[in-house]
Amino acid sequence: MDTITDSYAKQFAMIQYGAWDRLDDNKPFLTGYGEKPDVCNYYPLDITEAEFNAFEDADKDSWYTVIRRNDDGSLKSVWYHEAYAPEIRQICALLEKAVTLAEDPGLKNYLEKRIEAFKTDDYLDSDLAWMDMKDSKVDFV
């Protein structure tokens, strides 16, 4: 995104979540981009369906993992909190500040559980805390 100089193109890329136009069969609208990859960075670009199916790992189908290659070319599952550790730390730091400002006990509980969820990729408790909130004026997704 930082390399896009045209403000309209940058805004459109933000809306489209990338350089491909979702309303025009995912054709690239920026020069220098080819066909949109099927794997969208959740998997190695060169992975095949057969290779994925043969990959024996209990975490490979998790909603909270990406698949990467080891140095030897073999596949591995990487949890989001590991793959995106710098971003997760930043998110958690901001949420910790929000906890100190939260006046509603339900919101405070939710934020504390969400911080833990970001750190562990186990979101059930925070999702349940979200559903238990009744009076919060904040909608956080």
Regions found by a protein language model. Give the residues of each.
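Generic structural signal for short, flexible, solvent-exposed coil/loop and linker residues
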Residues: 96, 129-131
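Acidic/polar surface patches and capping/hinge elements
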Residues: 103, 107, 113-114, 118, ...
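N-terminal helix-rich structural modules
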Residues: 1-114
